[in-house]
Amino acid sequence: MKKPLIYVVDDNKITVKLMRRYLEVNGFEVGEAYDGVECLELVDKQKPDAIVLDVMMPRLDGYDTAKRLKSEASTKEIPVVIVTALNDVPNQIKAIDSGADDFLSKPIEEKLLVAKVRLLSNLSFSRKREKKLREVVASLQNGDKTYQWKPVDEILQEEGLI
């Protein structure tokens, strides 16, 4: 099975490097962006399993980036973790209202970051598997013989889902 792909988005290169290290040593593949616009461009090229997104960035902040991701059918299922030093309740609520799936306060605690990213990437993976299985069932119900004699495990393996 391939490593989960996580995008780390922060305008602070040191923070990106730190989170990259935390995630890579724990078995994740990491892509980087330094603002919301770059993040959206990356997502257009390849959908990640989760995004760790800073709030305060130039061009497009984390809240607006999350809103855009969650408003598009092709990206709304990508889990987003908002990360910020603004860790008061109003900002946590703003993160949730923007569509974020979780919230982390700076300074980043490695074990908590890894645990939340692992949880959300597993959720993303499960959603992809469920979607593929629903497609297979619908295909079989419609008389399509593409999957007729293939075991489910083989179908999921072909899709990189096991």
Say what each PLM segment does.
Residues 108-117:
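C-terminal output helix
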Residues 57, 69, 80:
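Receiver (REC) domain active-site loop signature in two-component systems and cognate sites
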Residues 16, 57-59, 76, 88, ...:
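The feature encodes the CheY-like receiver
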Residues 13-31:
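Two-component/phosphorelay signaling modules centered on CheY-like receiver
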Residues 46-52:
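Active-site beta3 strand of CheY-like receiver
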